[in-house]
Amino acid sequence: PKRLALISSKGTLDWAYPPFILGSAAGAMGWEVGIFFTFYGLTLLKPQLTAAVSPLGNPAMPMKMPFGPEGFQNINWAMPNLLMANVPGFESLATNLMKQTFHNKGVATIEELREACLDMGVRLIGCQMTMDVFGFKQEDFIPQAEIGGAATFLEYAADADVQLFI
């Protein structure tokens, strides 16, 4: 079978989707898949996922409403960074709006995608160096998470047909 090697380095909600979507899609196609979670991506291996999204500093992020009349939902709400940085709770609002929009569109949650990956035998490899730097222990993560260093991932990735850094 083909082999996919992914590196997941970010733990925000918007960056949590790509490795799990690609991993589960490749797994469903019968590919071998390994995802190496390093730096902030390592938090995606925790039992309770708390990934949030911040539109601050992300001008490409559309702010659309997941409710209301269709015309209202289709408005691109341009929010200046100054407003987003100074309004308490704005990150929480953006996170909830994104989750609701994904739900309305039938997109699986991060938890569901991670579970699908596990069901298909996708290897979820946590970076040992990142664990050491941030003070994590193996018991901080889901039991299915493998722990390995860069060499562990490179050995896997060397034989991969597709390698992506996300």
Q: How should each PLM-predicted stretch be described?
A:
Residues 41-55:
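N-terminal beta-loop-helix "entrance" segment that forms/cooperates
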Residues 6-16, 45:
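Short, glycine-rich nucleotide/cofactor-binding loops
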Residues 33-39, 125-128:
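Short internal beta-strands
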Residues 53-93, 106:
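A glycine-rich helix N-cap at a beta->alpha junction
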Residues 5-10, 93-102, 136-139:
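Short, basic, glycine/proline-bearing loop/turn elements
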Residues 126, 139-166:
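Glycine-rich, aromatic-bearing surface loops/beta-hairpins
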